[in-house]
């Protein structure tokens, strides 16, 4: 297997990352386990998930699969999409990020997530609120690194600028 450094973090990840979007929906638990095991046998140590994948089922299945080998793996998850019926269970507000992270940690059966992504840019929440919340969670050790998924380049640049200005995790 080929491993690469993940940016300037110093951690090494397999060149391929296994996405788990199909876990719990298109792929039942047995099919998900077969895919996961094939990846592990091939040396893959990098697994991507999100709270909204199969409305949490993907995280639950992945959490069961990583038991016993968690420390060897790089696990990602994401926050933003609607979970349940609560009107505030979506977006990048402090309330939703914290609630979503706690639920993801429980489903993944882990005390931390290696990379926690904002799944989308949230135009309704102040970027300062979002980034301060993520910085707090990095400080608490619940997430190791933060990331952005499905952001335009200008949105990433703006987030990096705000994080740098406040000396927050970026």
Q: PLM features: residue spans?
A:
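A generic structural signal for secondary-structure junctions
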Residues: 66-67, 80, 161-164
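A cross-domain feature marking catalytic cores of carbohydrate-active enzymes
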Residues: 20, 49-51, 77-79, 120, ...
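Glycine/proline-rich, positively charged
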Residues: 27, 37, 41, 84-170
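Ser/Thr-centric signal marking residues that sit
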Residues: 9, 45, 49, 77, ...
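N-terminal small/glycine-rich loop or linker at the start of catalytic domains
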Residues: 7-23, 76-89, 112-117
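N-terminal binding-site loop/beta-alpha segment at the start of enzyme catalytic domains
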Residues: 1-74
């Amino acid at each position: 297997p080929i491993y690469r450094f993940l940016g300037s973090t110093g951690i090494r990840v397999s060149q391929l990352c296994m996405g788990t979007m199909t876990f719990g929906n298109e792929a039942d638990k047995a099919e998900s386990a077969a895919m996961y095991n094939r990846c592990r046998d091939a040396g893959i140590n990098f697994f991507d998930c999100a709270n909204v994948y199969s409305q949490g089922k993907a995280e639950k299945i992945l959490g069961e699969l990583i038991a016993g080998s968690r420390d060897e793996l790089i696990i990602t998850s994401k926050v933003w999409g609607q979970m349940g019926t609560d009107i505030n269970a979506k977006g990048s507000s402090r309330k939703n990020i914290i609630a979503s992270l706690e639920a993801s940690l429980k489903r993944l059966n882990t005390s931390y997530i290696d990379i926690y992504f904002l799944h989308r840019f949230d135009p309704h929440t102040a970027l300062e609120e979002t980034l301060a919340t993520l910085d707090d969670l990095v400080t608490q050790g619940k997430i190791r690194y933060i990331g952005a998924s499905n952001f335009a380049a200008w949105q990433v640049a703006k987030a990096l600028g705000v994080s740098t200005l406040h000396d927050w995790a970026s």
